[in-house]
Amino acid sequence: MEGQTPGSRGLPEKPHPATAAATLSSMGAVFILMKSALGAGLLNFPWAFSKAGGVVPAFLVELVSLVFLISGLVILGYAAAVSGQATYQGVVRGLCGPAIGKLCEACFLLNLLMISVAFLRVIGDQLEKLCDSLLSGTPPAPQPWYADQRFTLPLLSVLVILPLSAPREIAFQKYTSILGTLAACYLALVITVQYYLWPQGLVRESHPSLSPASWTSVFSVFPTICFGFQCHEAAVSIYCSMRKRSLSHWALVSVLSLLACCLIYSLTGVYGFLTFGTEVSADVLMSYPGNDMVIIVARVLFAVSIVTVYPIVLFLGRSVMQDFWRRSCLGGWGPSALADPSGLWVRMPLTILWVTVTLAMALFMPDLSEIVSIIGGISSFFIFIFPGLCLICAMGVEPIGPRVKCCLEVWGVVSVLVGTFIFGQSTAAAVWEMF
């Protein structure tokens, strides 16, 4: 029956998820996971530390979140092996049934679309600030047409982002992910060093707040952490592209990736907050003098970092549309080239459509800080709720001892409840701030 889960059929052993080519090395998987997590959220972490009321409460929230973040990645790898599916939405649909699968697809597509828009908006802002810095020596005058992000962002999208987004497999992104990870490391290093060197023109708060105003303010940073560390959407695709897919090996890859990300995020958050205190901007680079050459280089490299992570997000969003194409009647009409959704004649139009839609939205979108809470709230579905549901549903697939089974089911329930709380709290707070 359509409503049956794999657990009702019973599987003697874990099938390997179907994938075109398992060519990704362990180090490549680490870099892609890191790059998926090291996105625009890096700029928001000093602001999140300020909102939480200081270093200690924010760091504690980060450590608690890290437990669930790593757990979610491990669960997704296990669920992919059990279900035999090669995409996040396919795993959820295979284990939890078609109804939850459709909900996952809708949330997945919406979340990735908004993340892509946010990334393009960050790139556009950095390009605009970079142009302002380079033209700062000229008298005040209207901004030249070639410095307007309405020109620079579409040009960058056509010449750089679109070619990087064209490849069929996610394994290709391991090359650009190394460059993007190094760019994120440079940003963290700059913020740390700037705190100690204290360059001329830098003004910081003399006595930053070191205690939270309320528990509500502490909980309010969860969406920023979810937005920052979200790499779970890519987890299944990365796992299925790896040459070595044992669960213990995947757990090691997940732990190493998130610990490295935690170090980079923590350095950025701590020293950005200690430098500016409660006056820190939601985009920490905006708090630094615009004519500082070190900051100008950081802007360029961070824009490069976001450019390299955008294709990963596009790949995941495109996979949802390809699944829809495969299940619908669209693939059965016309030439045989259109029957394969991963083929060039289907893949490239979907890629161009995604870039065009997100670019149009980015050029008219409000300030990034206004939607981070919403994105972070939706991300809780993919970090907490769906992995928890997959773990609960997967318990009937393999023979497991009753005590271990009970413990894993309890952990799945806890994960779902925590994700539901974060989604409700962050969404309510975002709506409240809008009005």
Curated annotation (Swiss-Prot):
Q: Which organism is it from?
A: Homo sapiens (Human)
Q: What does this protein do?
A: Electrogenic sodium-dependent amino acid transporter with a preference for L-glutamine, L-alanine, L-histidine, L-aspartate and L-arginine. May facilitate glutamine uptake in both excitatory and inhibitory neurons. The transport mechanism and stoichiometry remain to be elucidated.
Known disease link: Foveal hypoplasia 2: An isolated form of foveal hypoplasia, a developmental defect of the eye defined as the lack of foveal depression with continuity of all neurosensory retinal layers in the presumed foveal area. Clinical features include absence of foveal pit on optical coherence tomography, absence of foveal hyperpigmentation, absence of foveal avascularity, absence of foveal and macular reflexes, decreased visual acuity, and nystagmus. Optic nerve misrouting and anterior segment dysgenesis are observed in some FVH2 patients.
Question: What taxonomic ancestry is recorded?
Answer: Eukaryota, Metazoa, Chordata, Craniata, Vertebrata
Annotated coiled-coil segments of the chain:
none
InterPro entries in the record? AA_transpt_TM
- The reply on keyword Cytoplasm is yes
Family recorded in the similarity comment = Belongs to the amino acid/polyamine transporter 2 family.
The catalytic activity, as recorded, is: L-glutamine(out) = L-glutamine(in); L-alanine(in) = L-alanine(out); L-histidine(out) = L-histidine(in); L-aspartate(out) = L-aspartate(in)
Q: Which domain of life is it from?
A: Eukaryota
| Annotated protein name in UniProt | Solute carrier family 38 member 8
Expressed, tissue-wise, as follows: Expressed in fetal and adult brain, and spinal cord. In the brain, it is localized in the cell body and axon of the majority of neuronal cells and in a subset of glial cells. Found throughout the neuronal retina, with higher expression levels in the inner and outer plexiform layers and the photoreceptor layer. Very weak expression is also present in the kidneys, thymus, and testes.
Keywords attached to this entry? Amino-acid transport, Cell projection, Cytoplasm, Disease variant, Membrane, Transmembrane, Transmembrane helix, Transport
Any one GO CC term of this protein is:
membrane
Q: Which GO annotations describe the biological process of this protein?
A: amino acid transmembrane transport; aspartate metabolic process; neuron projection development; optic nerve development; response to virus; retinal pigment epithelium development; viral genome replication; visual perception
